[in-house]
Amino acid sequence: NVETPHFQNMRRPFGKLKDILQPIIAPVHNTVEEIISRIGLKPEDIDFICYDHLHTQDLRKWLGSFEKPAYFPNAKLLVMHQEWEAVKDLLPLQRNWHCPFGVEGIDPDKIISLHSSILLGDSLALIHTPGYTQGSQSLVAHTENGLLVCSHNGISVDNYTPELSTIYG
């Protein structure tokens, strides 16, 4: 999220060029809204959302707040208890990595605070994977091609299907 102080600090030295350089340095290929529409879902079809951790996230867009309606009106956030408690009471050094007011005004009933890993059906699990943050979590799916783990360090298709990668090495 560009409102996160860390990213604001990175953009500041570029002055007026920052908006010109943004699509070159960090292009946006798709938005959540575009993908939801493309696969034939409506925002009200989404029941749950989750993140590997809450750095840089402004959850108000998706879950709503006292001032703004939710893009996903029926969705609840699945989040590890440690992560949720930390984001509500950030230490000064942590604030640089969090969107200002990113959880402010969210209805507490939209938060499902988990104390351990959980199964989400027969072939999907949300696993507590502390390390990067105390509340980091990873999605693990059992697919016809084996296990697929989606976590913090998976940032491109090459991370998830290295056998198809065109990156040398």
Regions found by a protein language model. Give the residues of each.
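Accessory terminal helices/loops
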Residues: 145-146, 155-169
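Active-site neighborhood of phospho(di)ester-bond hydrolases with catalytic His/Asp-centered motifs
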Residues: 47-53, 78-80, 127-131, 149-153
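Active-site environment of divalent metal-dependent phosphoester hydrolases
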Residues: 53-60, 85, 133-137, 157-159
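A short secondary-structure junction signal
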Residues: 60-64, 87-92, 137-140, 161-163
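Metallo-beta-lactamase
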Residues: 24-41, 71-128
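Active-site metal-binding motif and surrounding structural segment of the metallo-beta-lactamase
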Residues: 17, 21-75
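Conserved beta-strand hairpin/beta-sheet module of binuclear metal-dependent hydrolase folds
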Residues: 1-34, 138-154
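Short polar/acidic secondary-structure junctions
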Residues: 118, 130-131, 142-144
